[in-house]
């Protein structure tokens, strides 16, 4: 796998090693050993995934921007196995020099790229194809009582979702999240969420 650092520390793009021939292709979508060897030294700590999730959505669906509050914080490793999505991580750690900044990456069934989102970030995606199947690994179980979010349509974040606003399809819950300026983050850059 090839690890690409982004403009925000700890947010990583991962390109798998793909083997193609006349029959099609093969790649390891996840190897704990290789993740430990290549990603852990960059992060400075281990990440142990415990839950895999999958969603299917149609064009214009936007999910996010989600996170789980302490003590149930989550890191995520995400990929698109069918279709095309724009995936985004927003730094919501108080005191961070990149607070409110984001990294956006297009994940597709053709590029097989994966995106690592650390704890302390809000995560969301928009479906750019007719349908998309999205998979993600989490290092903590889902805890609905710790569920949180910020508005995925907050213009102050400067995210180009590549979808006209009139085509955006959000859940009722996601329409109620606060904008960043009205948001009191439960995360602080000086608190190690991996201890």
Feature names for model-found ranges:
Residues 1-110, 131, 138-195:
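Non-catalytic, conserved peripheral segments adjacent to functional cores
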């Amino acid at each position: 796998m090839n690890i690409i650092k982004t403009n925000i520390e700890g947010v990583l793009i991962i390109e798998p090693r793909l083997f193609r021939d006349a029959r099609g292709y093969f790649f390891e979508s996840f190897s704990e050993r290789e993740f430990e060897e290549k990603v852990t030294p960059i992060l400075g700590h281990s990440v142990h995934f415990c839950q895999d999730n999958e969603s299917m959505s149609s064009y214009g669906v936007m999910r996010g921007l989600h996170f789980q509050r302490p003590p149930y914080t989550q890191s995520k490793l995400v990929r698109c196995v069918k279709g095309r999505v724009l995936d985004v991580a927003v730094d919501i750690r108080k005191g961070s020099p990149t607070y409110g900044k984001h990294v956006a990456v297009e994940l597709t069934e053709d590029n097989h790229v994966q995106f690592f989102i650390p704890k302390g970030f809000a995560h969301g995606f928009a479906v750019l194809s007719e349908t998309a199947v999205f998979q993600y690994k989490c290092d903590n179980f889902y805890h609905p009582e710790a569920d949180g979010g910020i508005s995925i349509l907050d213009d102050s974040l400067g995210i180009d979702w590549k979808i006209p606003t009139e085509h955006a399809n959000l859940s009722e819950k996601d329409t109620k999240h606060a904008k960043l300026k009205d948001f009191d983050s439960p995360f602080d850059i000086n608190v190690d969420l991996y201890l």
